[in-house]
Amino acid sequence: MKIAVLLSGGVDSSYSAYSLKEQGHELVGIYLKLHASEKKHDLYIKNAQKACEFLGIPLEVLDFQKDFKSAVYDEFISAYEEGQTPNPCALCNPLMKFGLALDHALKLGCEKIATGHYARVKEIDKVSYIQEAVDKTKDQSYFLYALEHEVIAKLVFPLGDLLKKDIKPLALNAMPFLGTLETYKESQEICFVEKSYIDTLKKHVEVEKEGVVKNLQGEVIGTHKGYMQYTIGKRKGFNIKGALEPHFVVGIDAKKNELIVGKKEDLATHSLKAKNKSLTKDFKDGEYFIKARYRSVPAKAFVSLRDEVIEVEFEEPFYGVAKGQALVVYKDDILLGGGVIV
């Protein structure tokens, strides 16, 4: 089978390509220029080229920087301006990697596209679904909720059945040169955030704009450094007059540049809604497991679809729900889709 492999210049994607080559597939390497300095792109392309030379496969470089900026990066900035906590990876996957890049791969005659994502594809009754990775600590299925069945059927995740801790030893044994590659240490999960998301925002908007902090009764009880520097659940970085116990951000009013704070129990949510829904075609109202943050433990909830809006009623209180984050629905370890929390 002819498969396109997205190569980032790192160990995971390189080993993904190696494992597919060992299985006898015909491969085409693809490097995506999305958002980084030219210096970084040059290094990553050089690393990807070394992997391709080792495997004896071609490498194509696709420049999607303009598309990425308008569809993902600018949306990230806008969401924070609106007081939300966005999830750019959940946007990038369907639009860039499994959108534009997949389209290009199909034009090259490839039947499928592979990445180093920690996830799996499972076929149930001839329909392809995303399944959680074996390594639950590194599972990335959460970011793939917006993919259609027809797209999922064209995906390959060679690392989905492996543990993250085993990848590097396996890769170095198979491809010794990987241990000598120069690289940049990424400090954030978001590819275009080099130091902190606040530093990224500062390049485009006024972040340090002091405002007031109010309690749930609407009383002014302190000050903050600028609403975009805070997310739901944060308990530091603002001043509360005479505070004797911890206060947490429970609400953000972007238009007024105000924070609303409360006690930890005030972070509890019993229900929520999500828009821009992307659910499996056979979805039915019922009890499922929910993730409302990437690192959150799946929570039991009753999920229903009302006029294109996903409505969730949690079995137990869920803490720290932020507007703009992805709400993802699972049946056991099978991904059924999700939406954006409103």
UniProtKB/Swiss-Prot annotation:
It is an enzyme of class 2 (transferase). Catalyzes the 2-thiolation of uridine at the wobble position (U34) of tRNA, leading to the formation of s(2)U34. The active site is at residues 92, 191. GO terms for molecular function: ATP binding; tRNA binding; tRNA-uridine 2-sulfurtransferase activity. It comes from the Bacteria. ATP binds at residues 6-13, 32, 116. Its EC number is 2.8.1.13. GO terms for cellular component: cytoplasm. Residues 138-140, 293-294 are annotated as: Interaction with tRNA. The keyword Disulfide bond applies. It comes from Helicobacter pylori (strain HPAG1). It catalyses: S-sulfanyl-L-cysteinyl-[protein] + uridine(34) in tRNA + AH2 + ATP = 2-thiouridine(34) in tRNA + L-cysteinyl-[protein] + A + AMP + diphosphate + H(+). It is found in: Cytoplasm. This is tRNA-specific 2-thiouridylase MnmA. Belongs to the MnmA/TRMU family. Pfam families: tRNA_Me_trans, tRNA_Me_trans_C, tRNA_Me_trans_M. SUPFAM superfamilies: Adenine nucleotide alpha hydrolases-like. One of its GO terms (biological process) is tRNA wobble position uridine thiolation. The record marks 117, 325 as: Interaction with tRNA. Keywords: ATP-binding, Cytoplasm, Disulfide bond, Nucleotide-binding, RNA-binding, Transferase, tRNA processing, tRNA-binding. The gene is mnmA.
